[in-house]
Design a protein with these regions (language model features):
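N-terminal Rossmann-like FAD-binding beta1-loop-alpha1 element of flavoenzymes
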Residues: 2-29
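Conserved protein kinase catalytic core
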Residues: 37-38, 125, 174
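Helical element adjacent to the flavin cofactor pocket in flavoenzyme catalytic cores
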Residues: 138-174
């Protein structure tokens, strides 16, 4: 008898299986495709967002910032390549600066580490090949990239080694 059934083994299903595999639970993952991360996850942009987009005070804001830090820890634990490259949101006209200011304020309220506004000069010094009409940027150094396929596969492999059943080519219809 199963304690937990997880439907889908993209990055969310694999992460759920990985975390649950550390408990004494009978867990199974049912994946419709013939491999892990074979649908939406493998086409993901690979960006681990810093957390300045969600509305402050929401669960999404809290989970975005916590999840970004947790992903870094899991990648290190599972030897998944992780590149903390930061992110820039550019303003190409003065009219766009208030939007960046709002994102900055969200980031501060959400606890995004190291987030800051950059002048045009600071932005171009950081990324000299940008369009010369840049007037400023929002910089979030905690943003990172990771191969979503490698990340999901590593978590699924550990989950299976820890006793989670993985059923591939097994769509759930109801």
């Amino acid at each position: 008898m199963l304690d937990v059934a997880i439907i889908g083994c993209g990055v969310i299903g694999a992460a759920s299986a990985y975390e649950l595999s550390h408990y004494r639970l009978q867990t199974a993952v049912f994946e419709a495709e013939n491999d892990v991360a074979d649908c939406t996850t493998k086409a993901n942009s690979a960006i681990l967002h810093a957390g300045y987009d969600p509305e402050p005070g929401t669960q999404m804001a809290r989970l975005n910032v916590e999840g970004s830090a947790l992903a870094k820890e899991i990648c290190a634990r599972l030897d998944v390549p992780y590149r903390q490259c930061g992110s820039l949101v550019l303003a190409l006209s003065p009219e766009e600066l208030p939007h960046l200011q709002k994102l900055y304020e969200n980031g501060i309220a959400n606890g995004v580490p190291g987030i800051r506004m950059l002048s045009a000069e600071e932005t171009l010094a950081m990324e000299p090949n940008l369009a010369p009409n840049v007037v400023g940027a929002l910089y979030a150094p905690s943003a990172a990239i990771v191969s979503p396929w490698d990340f999901a596969l590593a978590m699924a492999e550990v989950a299976v080694r820890n006793g989670v059943e993985l059923h591939r080519s097994c769509p759930v219809t109801h």
